[in-house]
Every structure is written in C-alpha cells, then in structure tokens.
Amino acid sequence: MEYRITEKAAFTVVGFGKRFNSETSYTEIPKFWDEYYNGEGCKGMNGMFGACVDCDGESFDYYIADIYLPWQEVPEGYKVVSFDAGEWAVFPWHGECPEALQSVNTYVWNEWLPGTKEYKLRANYNLEVYLSDTEGEIWLPIEKV
C-alpha cells in the first residue's frame, strides 16, 4: 500500500461533530455526511476534512471540518480543534467514497500500524482529507519508535 511520511506545521480546523462508536462508524459516518449536507447544519462548510478526535479505541468524536481562520466566526454548535506540528503518515485513496476510503482505513489500522516497526501513534486523533469526490488521503500522526 502506497504511503508517505511528511512533516506538517500545527493547524486548526472548525467543524460540526458527533461521537461515534468504532464498531458502527463505517455505516453511521456516511449517514452523518448526508444528514449534514441535506439538513440545516451546513453553514458554508466545504467539508475538506473528516477529523477523528479523542479516539479511545471504542468511540471517537468525528467532525466534518474545514481549516479554521482566526478571524472566522464559529457557528453555533461547531467546535474548533487544533492539531500539533509533527510527522504524519499519509495514505492516499482513489475511487468511490466511502468504499475506497474505508478500504484504506481498514488497512491502516489493521495491517500497517500493527505491523510497522518504525512508527507509533503520537496522538489520539487522525484525519480524512477530501481532495475530490473520488480522491483523498488518511493522515495518521506518528513518531519514531
């Protein structure tokens, strides 16, 4: 599976979120996106990111998010989330979403991360980056073992 290691500066996103169970997230998160864009929650957000935060192995907060700009007003019900500078493992995906994204995500968590001898997670968050409807990346915060 193709991936790259890259250094990223600290950054902040703003997003609309909900807590999800890890067991049902592959079914529930696509529904959350549909509800968000078909409902009244969409307050000018493009949804560049799917930010998974406060992951404890059983559940996590998931935010449909965009880059936060300091002068930006945060809509009611939205949250600002910051990510530390550091190394990230970046895994591209190509194809229909959510299937292509979920396939790479399963590989990352079930094969790559348990199998790598060089890296470990450095934080309890990760990101889905949406480049188009059929292309994106999964970003995993890592550090050398």
Regions found by a protein language model. Give the residues of each.
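A solvent-exposed interaction/effector surface
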Residues: 1-145
